[in-house]
Amino acid sequence: MKLGIVIFPSKMIQDKANGLRKRYDPHYALVPPHITLKTPFETQDEQLESIVNELHTIASKTNPFALHVGKVGSFAPVNNVLYFKVEKTPELTFLNEEMHSGFFTQEREYAFVPHLTIGQGLSDAEHADVLGRLRMKDFYYEQPIDRFHLLYQLENGTWTVHETFRLGKGNN
C-alpha cells in the first residue's frame, strides 16, 4: 500500500489553492491541497498498525502551531512546480525530521521545503508566464495547525485519509 503524511490547510486556503490548481495542476482531482510532511512511500499492510502508533507518538511530542502561507515560489529549473511558500517553523521542521528518522528512516529525494503546490507539469513557457503573473499578487494566510493526516492511495490514484493525529500531549 502507498501512504503519505500531510497537513491540510483551512478551507479558505484550500479554496484559494484549488482556484489555481484547477488550471495548473493535473493532480487536482487526486488529492486536496496539502503540505507534505513525508512524501508517498510503499509499505506492507502488516506495518500499518506500527506506523499509526509511531505517528501518535510523534503527534504527542509536537505542540500545535501557526501555519504561515504566502507568496508564490517555484522549484524551477529542477521541476516546473509552482507553490505557495509555507514558513518553515520549528514545529514543521520537527515533524519532518521525525518522519525521516528512527522508525521512518528512508532516503530523502529533496531537502524539506514546506509548500502548497498550485501548479505542476507546466511547459517552460507556461511556467514562466504563470509564475510572473502570480508573483505580482499578494498572498498571505495564517492559521492554527493542531493535526496532521496519514493518507493512503486508492487504486484509481486518489488519496484518502486513513487516520488523523492531533498535536500535543493527551490528544491521541
From Swiss-Prot:
The enzyme's E.C. designation: 3.1.-.-
Enzyme class: hydrolase
Location of the motif HXTX 1: 34-37
One Pfam family this sequence matches: 2_5_RNA_ligase2
Transmembrane segments: none
Short motif HXTX 2, span: 115-118
Active site per the UniProt annotation: 34 (proton donor), 115 (proton acceptor)
SUPFAM superfamilies for the chain: LigT-like (SSF55144)
InterPro entries: 2H_phosphoesterase_YjcG-like (IPR050580), Cyclic_Pdiesterase (IPR009097), YjcG (IPR022932)
Keyword set, alphabetical order: Hydrolase
GO molecular function: hydrolase activity, acting on ester bonds
UniProt keyword Methyltransferase, yes or no: no
Keyword Flavoprotein part of the UniProt annotation: no
Highest taxon of source: Bacteria
Family membership: Belongs to the 2H phosphoesterase superfamily. YjcG family.
Matches recorded under PANTHER family: PHOSPHOESTERASE SAOUHSC_00951-RELATED, PHOSPHOESTERASE YJCG-RELATED
Protein name according to UniProt: Putative phosphoesterase BCE_1348
Organism: Bacillus cereus (strain ATCC 10987 / NRS 248)
